Amino acid sequence: MTAIIDIIGREILDSRGNPTVEVDVHLEDGSFGRAAVPSGASTGAHEAVELRDGGTRYLGKGVERAVDAVNGEIFEAIGGLDAENQIQIDRTMFELDGTPNKSRLGANAILGVSLAVAKAAAEAAGLPLYRYVGGPNAHLLPVPMMNIINGGAHADNPIDFQEFMIMPVGAETLKDAVRMGSEVFHTLKKQLAADGHNTNVGDEGGFAPGLASAPAALDFIMKSIEKAGYRPGEDMYVALDCASTEFFKDGKYVLEGEGRTLEPGAMAEYLAELAGKYPIVSIEDGMAEDDWDGWKALTDLIGNKCQLVGDDLFVTNSARLRDGIKMGVANSILVKVNQIGSLSETLDAVETAHKARYTAVMSHRSGETEDSTIADLAVATNCGQIKTGSLARSDRLAKYNQLIRIEEQLGPQAQYAGRSILRG
């Protein structure tokens, strides 16, 4: 009854107007699942490969080759298989691809099918996706990391760090957390406008003002939290995504906006200084993706009191994560489904992290769609944190709105992670 009878891949557009893959999966019993694949702007060198067409069409960014793989080879290989056997389906696609990084068929093709299969199986079981994937204990609503100021590769301004986020840990519920974040977001907009800054929003819905440094951005955020009626370091904390690989050159960290170049040890000390001055509870990619010594220095310095998240470092890859665990590097993994390219491998990465007492943060990409799958996966894995952009742009709000629905569905079972995510 849950055999796959049809798979339809198509090329659609993401939130940046670039092509991406969408997949429909139909089952024998009439059940249906649809998934759209996200895409990143700053990508790690060790990520699974997103297949693009090249040439002049869509300026080389078309995904017709990946769509053809979905409608051709992949359907031929998994048509007739039971949608409830996720691991078998994913493994069949890995073997069909035959490369270590999914570069032949494309991680975008494989992931689209993988997620759509899970959604179809959930519908066949009469369960919401979070319950189907997570089982009866899926009940924890994540603390949002809300990206309200953008720099780096996500903005055309002098700020070197890529994202400045707020985390409403003092909320009682996810719904309250979204409200608190929205209030701070709109307060920040007024503060920026009053000081003559641009308030246009970037790829992820955050503002990209012409501020010169990380401290300048953090000072604005502190003022906005207070003006919105909340207490920094009590109701609301701050998280950073440095995306340090983007400015790591010849073994040094070149902070052009701040006019200085730092050795890895000095970069670690600078981040420790910021974490001491501001209520920063999470730093993502504080060091470059292959600067393992720098990561170790940063972890030794503040890993006992600050969440240190590996994004480009781990790329949702359990093998790289295990290397980091052995070396005592970082203490958290950012989980992006398209970095690894399948649902089963994504779940394995979260499980590997939790077994080692590392935290996991479910994450969007800068190129998103209205697909809200990651909201369900955050609850399914009880990971307790989600990074899905600002309080603007419907591609970001789709995830927050889905979390509000899930919290409502769970009723008294629902628990907001809140302060439980804090270290030290």
UniProtKB/Swiss-Prot annotation:
What are the positions of the active site? 204, 336
Q: Where in the cell is it found?
A: Cytoplasm; Secreted; Cell surface
What InterPro entries does the annotation carry? Enolase (IPR000941), Enolase-like_C_sf (IPR036849), Enolase-like_N (IPR029017), Enolase_C (IPR020810), Enolase_CS (IPR020809), Enolase_N (IPR020811)
Query: Its GO biological process terms?
Result: glycolytic process
Cofactor needs: Mg(2+)
What Pfam families does UniProt report for this protein, alphabetically? Enolase_C, Enolase_N
Q: Report which reactions are catalysed by this protein.
A: (2R)-2-phosphoglycerate = phosphoenolpyruvate + H2O
Binding residues for (2R)-2-phosphoglycerate: 162, 336, 365-366, 387
Role summary: Catalyzes the reversible conversion of 2-phosphoglycerate (2-PG) into phosphoenolpyruvate (PEP). It is essential for the degradation of carbohydrates via glycolysis.
Designated name of the protein: Enolase
Q: Provide the species name.
A: Sinorhizobium medicae (strain WSM419)
| Gene designation | eno
